[in-house]
Amino acid sequence: MLIHPNFDPVAIHLGPLAVRWYGLMYLVAFIAAIVVGRLRLRLPYVAAQGWTAKDIDDMLFYGVLGTILGGRLGYVLFYKASFYFAHPLDIFKVWEGGMSFHGGFLGVTLAMVLFAYQRKRSWLQVTDFVAPMVPTGLAAGRLGNFINGELWGRVTDPSAPWAMLFPGAAPDDAAWLAAHPQLAAQWHLNEVFAQYHMLPRHPSELYEIALEGVALFFVLFFFSRKPKPMGAISAVFLIGYGLARFTVEFAREPDDFLGLLAMGLSMGQWLSLPMILVGIGLLVWSYRRARREPAQAVSAS
């Protein structure tokens, strides 16, 4: 059984300024996106479409705005709408936390539509170019969550070699024991709690790094090395992320203010299902269009 390292959330102290790890991970995410994007410029079919390093820089500007605005508004609307409607000024307190990937995804999508309009490109051509740049950023964000010791997983069997004790979850663990006496007895969790005052949980942030970050990066990296029908790379991203997130949510602790929703699924799972379905539909449309219009259907990504 492992114990979370309980990192200091502040990475660097610069006089009165405190640079937090989570904020630093945003910087890492955008630097990684620049690196991956410039590597993609070396692909002959990408270069032939006229993409440049300046395009990447401009897209990231749009992407930063879409991520922050969409991520925050998505969290407000999807997760704590009643609270923020009652306390609207708290919406602007982003330093207190509260970002949603699905909201950020919608924000970035709208930002890329605007970028495509201004550059007179197809928006699917733009999202196909951007999609392989995203997983490294997702991994950085989840690493920030892990360093902060937040968004931990559900309680699990302490005999699992990956089971981890999260100090931040300790206030909820006594209530969990009272609510799940059978599992507590089966996994001998009362003894564990008596010794550590915490319960073992899935390190779900690390699962997300592995699936949404590493695995999805390599899937998109190899899939996009050669020309694909326009929309296909975006579709693979939607399907890949949706499946990864839907799967990890079974091990991730649901938000305490929402719990599990219909059919025993979490909010993250319900928001991921449309991504999977839209991705499948887009993939089918993409290849059917390529067969009908082979000369025009190849993506620039």
Swiss-Prot record:
One of its GO terms (molecular function) is phosphatidylglycerol-prolipoprotein diacylglyceryl transferase activity. It holds the Pfam family LGT. InterPro entries: Lgt. Its EC number is 2.5.1.145. A 1,2-diacyl-sn-glycero-3-phospho-(1'-sn-glycerol) binds at residue 142. Its main location: membrane. It is found in: Cell inner membrane. Pathway: Protein modification; lipoprotein biosynthesis (diacylglyceryl transfer). It is a multi-pass membrane protein. Keywords: Cell inner membrane, Cell membrane, Membrane, Transferase, Transmembrane, Transmembrane helix. One of its GO terms (biological process) is lipoprotein biosynthetic process. The keyword Transmembrane helix applies. One of its GO terms (cellular component) is plasma membrane. It comes from the Bacteria. The chain crosses the membrane at residues 17-37, 59-79, 97-117, 230-250, 265-285. Belongs to the Lgt family. Catalyzes the transfer of the diacylglyceryl group from phosphatidylglycerol to the sulfhydryl group of the N-terminal cysteine of a prolipoprotein, the first step in the formation of mature lipoproteins. This is Phosphatidylglycerol--prolipoprotein diacylglyceryl transferase. It comes from Paraburkholderia xenovorans (strain LB400). The lineage of its organism: Bacteria, Pseudomonadati, Pseudomonadota, Betaproteobacteria, Burkholderiales.
